[in-house]
Amino acid sequence: MRALSKQQPGEGIWMIETEVPTPGPNDLLIRIRKGSICGTDVHIYKWDDWASQTVPVPMVVGHEYVGVVAGMGSEVRGFEIGDRVSGEGHVTCGHCRNCRAGRRHLCRNTQGVGVNRPGSFAEYLVLPAFNAFKLPDDIPDDVAAIFDPFGNAVHTALSFDLVGEDVLITGAGPIGCMAAAVARHVGARNVVITDVNDYRLDLARQMGVTRAVNVAREDLWTVATQELDMHEGFDVGMEMSGSGPAFAQMVSVMNNGGKVALLGIPSGEVQIDWNAVIFKMLTIKGIYGREMFETWYKMAALIQSGLDLTPVITHHYGIGDFQQGFDAMLSGQSGKVILDWETEEQSA
């Protein structure tokens, strides 16, 4: 089969020919239809410090996908050949304290699909059946292919009650844009998103934000007070950028008693005004991945109840043009980029 692999240290991803993997007794063999390029895949492509310290090479990459069950192990129950599935990319141990308590997203021994074990940028993927999520028929392939990052957005956005609240999101990447759409869908009052990338701020507008703010040119507090008539600060914050200055600004504009969810990963140490955190009595929660599998059920329900993610999907390529897909991601002028394993050449 064909697969996209990190074959050696250094920049790049390579198309290779390799053997179709054999499922173990508790595994599914999934034939991949479509995949999506994640920021993690870009880190691996660029071979930055995180990637070089984390990913063994060679490694088939990718963890955002939709496919169909093509085979299964002898112990698998509840799936049939031809079932359309996506899957949880964090493979947990099942025996640590958190796993045994049903909190698998907190597993200390998590392995990442496409990071620590072979990934989904391939014609076939082997995945523990426990990790597979059977998809409702009314969720299209393009949307199903981005369920993994959508899950990050849903986990972050639904960490706190949003009904009637004023929400600040820092970082208008695809996950930030999807989190904004979730916040509006479930009843937030104002949803404000900040970034310095005009392309991505425009995507956020298409996803329904109240106001998109380029903080390189506009003052966030002025927008909040003068345009939106908000004089006490934001109730809920979602930090999606990994930017230290963005997080510092978020802390400064939160209302007393505000709640902050952190998904963005900083590239280095970040200075925090702990006095503001203490005297405003802020709640800060770290987010990693998705709750298994409550987040997945909520994702499906949100789509089935009318949440539209299609504006965030901006590029499609056949697998023969995978390099163009990575180039689009590297440009910073894209939302989600879909790679079609059933088409050689296609772009939009």
Curated annotation (Swiss-Prot):
Recorded superkingdom: Bacteria
Binding site for Zn(2+) 2: 93, 96, 99, 107
Short name of one Pfam family: ADH_N
Record: residues binding NAD(+): 175, 195, 200, 263-265, 287-288
Record GO biological process: L-threonine catabolic process to glycine
Keyword terms: Cytoplasm, Metal-binding, NAD, Oxidoreductase, Zinc
Disulfide bonds: none
SMART domains on file: PKS_ER
Metabolic or biological pathway, per its Swiss-Prot or TrEMBL entry: Amino-acid degradation; L-threonine degradation via oxydo-reductase pathway; glycine from L-threonine: step 1/2
Cofactors that this protein relies on: Zn(2+)
Site residues, Important for catalytic activity for the proton relay mechanism but does not participate directly in the coordination of zinc atom: 148
Free-text cofactor note: Binds 2 Zn(2+) ions per subunit.
GO molecular function: L-threonine 3-dehydrogenase activity; zinc ion binding
InterPro entries linked: ADH-like_C (IPR013149), ADH-like_N (IPR013154), ADH_Zn_CS (IPR002328), GroES-like_sf (IPR011032), L-Threonine_3-DHase (IPR004627), NAD(P)-bd_dom_sf (IPR036291), PKS_ER (IPR020843), Zn_alcohol_dh (IPR050129)
Quaternary assembly: Homotetramer.
Described purpose of this protein according to its UniProt entry: Catalyzes the NAD(+)-dependent oxidation of L-threonine to 2-amino-3-ketobutyrate.
Record's protein name: L-threonine 3-dehydrogenase
Organism of origin: Deinococcus radiodurans (strain ATCC 13939 / DSM 20539 / JCM 16871 / CCUG 27074 / LMG 4051 / NBRC 15346 / NCIMB 9279 / VKM B-1422 / R1)
Organism taxonomic ancestry: Bacteria, Thermotogati, Deinococcota, Deinococci, Deinococcales
